[in-house]
From Swiss-Prot:
UniProt cross-references to InterPro entries, sorted A to Z: DEATH-like_dom_sf (IPR011029), Death_dom (IPR000488), THO_THOC1 (IPR021861)
Disulphide bridges: none
Biased composition (Basic and acidic residues): 418-427
Function: Component of the THO subcomplex of the TREX complex which is thought to couple mRNA transcription, processing and nuclear export, and which specifically associates with spliced mRNA and not with unspliced pre-mRNA. Required for efficient export of polyadenylated RNA. The THOC1-THOC2-THOC3 core complex alone is sufficient to bind export factor NXF1-NXT1 and promote ATPase activity of DDX39B. Participates in an apoptotic pathway which is characterized by activation of caspase-6, increases in the expression of BAK1 and BCL2L1 and activation of NF-kappa-B. This pathway does not require p53/TP53, nor does the presence of p53/TP53 affect the efficiency of cell killing. Activates a G2/M cell cycle checkpoint prior to the onset of apoptosis. Apoptosis is inhibited by association with RB1. Essential for early embryonic development. Required for normal gene expression during postnatal testis development.
Changes seen on gene knockout: Knockdown animals exhibit an impaired startle response, suggesting hearing dysfunction. They show greatly reduced hair cell numbers.
GO biological process, one term: regulation of apoptotic process
Gene symbol of the encoding locus: thoc1
A GO molecular-function annotation: DNA binding
Record comment regarding domains: An intact death domain is needed for apoptosis.
Chief location: nucleus
Region of interest (Disordered), ranges: 403-427, 539-574
Keywords attached to this entry: Apoptosis, Cytoplasm, DNA-binding, mRNA processing, mRNA splicing, mRNA transport, Nucleus, RNA-binding, Transcription, Transcription regulation, Transport
Name of the protein in question: THO complex subunit 1
Highest taxon in the source lineage: Eukaryota
Amino acid sequence: MSPPSHFDFIEARDKFTVATKNAVDTRNCKPLTTAFSHLPGNETEKKATLDQALRGVLEEQIVNQKVNVDDFLSLIYISIDGVTEGICSATTPFLLLGDVLDCLPLDQCDKIFSFVEENVSTWKSNTFYSAGKNYLLRMCNDLLRRLSKSQNTVFCGRIQLFLARLFPLSEKSGLNLQSQFNLDNITVFNKNEQDSTLGQQHTEVKEEGMDVEEGEMGDEDAPAPSSIPIDYNLYRKFWTLQDYFRNPVQCYDKFSWMTFIKYSDEALAVFKSFKLDDMQASKKKLEEMRTSSGDHVYFAKFLTSEKLMDLQLSDSNFRRHILLQYLILFQYLKGQVKFKSSSCVLNDDQSLWIEDTTKLVYQLLKEIPPDGDKFGSMVEHILNTEENWNSWKNEGCPSFVKERPAETKPIRPSRKRQAPEDFLGKGPDRKILMGNDELTRLWNLNPDNMEACKSENREFMPSLEDFFEEAIEQADPANMVEDEYKVVRNSNYGWRALRLLSRRSPHFFQPTNQQFKSLADYLENMVIKLAKELPKDIPSEEIKTGEEDDDENGDNLLKDSNDSPSIQSKAVTNSQMDEIAAKLGSQWKTLADHLEMSDKEIRVIESDSEDVDLQAKMLLVAWQDREGSQATMESLVTALNAAGFNNIADNLSET
């Protein structure tokens, strides 16, 4: 018996190289299969050698620049057939594709990628998908890095569509599981007012352009719409809104939200004041616009030149883009997102503003020609169905493919054996024997254990009258019990009293504006309320409170009552803030120091508006938002007196 022949890598590679070139010329994989079967060695060695030979032939083709793209594709087709025949590795076609795309210029890469798109069904087959999906993803990402987002927009879109067709919807690599934003999408615009040309050219353009437009208009055409007055402030505020659309989390910050509201109101006011009704005045003009425009052109990035601002605001597509951004932002702010921070919550005022503004945005969308009503209804329908997508993302993006349930044989119900007599006992009573006389007696006291637990004999919670009887007696000023000896000062008693009040008294759940420094003060207040409601047969004289006899008892806690409103609990109304802001004027910074406003907050207020009255109003609003329920009339009066505004404080106290 002859020994097995030795496998020579160099010789095998040379033979595979010759066979590969013949296969490329004949467009047939048969020379490779023949060479593979005649060479000695195991299958793994021959596969690795053939993979190396294929990449070597590709290298020669790339170095020889006379070879066209079809020759590259022929070699890749041969490798695909080789994988199908089982003579080369499943990753070889993807390695060849990656080498070709890395070495060719972009114009030829376009043709190679067309081949990749056409064979998406091949890549998704069981033979290639698991072995090549990571290679294809890496290849597409490398290609996207080489392409320009502005000049190669179509090519970039084709790559994204290919990846969407290749991977299933639940593929983790293509999902934004943590709901992250593209923070690199920064809108660049002129932020220096000194470099602005809006104020210099506005009057000249208006005077020179008006005569030309009027002279060119025909008798049948509608009158030209008036130009929208644009200054640098409107330009800056309008494009600043893009930063909020880019990163919606900013809206949860108080001062950023105030800025967003102000800028949005001004931008939407421009859309509302200057409508595009004139575009529908003439059917002839509309038809000319449709025929002359040709194919629809999509711009992936806004143009922020100051000279284009007037034209952009008069363009229906531009308005729709901006208004649609508002609706998407509002849906994110109102929606339930799994990865939102616990602090990202809207208050009632923010929710109300979003609701009103959403209605305004839909109204403006329906007023934009052409087909405004149809477009608005379509957008509303799409955003409603988007809720299903949000729910799917919150659930971790489970697969839409339902797995077949495993076929299980029906389980036979097991027979229950009867309890033995030594456990249930004998006779009509059939007591349960626990193995001990005392345990047996306790277990069989009642046939139904649940009913036994509900018995009145097991009710150990005392009544309010019995538990608070001693505390009510001590609260009577006539008994002259010092505070340190009262039972409400006992922490153990206070803990049990709170538990009893939560189970038996409705006062425990009623909100109160009165502030208590300790648990004992709170319990004394509750004792007074209970004394008025409980029966009068308690062995004590009628309870006297500090309200009835101020001279005998100076107990301030019993004197206070929550039944009547006072200046301590009054909140500052919006009209009062307007009146105070008008009186403060430019001196609002003096009050800001006594309201403990930081320098950063003051700078934000100054940058948002140049009107001193509005700045004073924003100061009071920011203080009220920060303090919440503590922003009372008393606190504001104290701050006004400390700042030296005694006249304003006196007028506020009188109201």
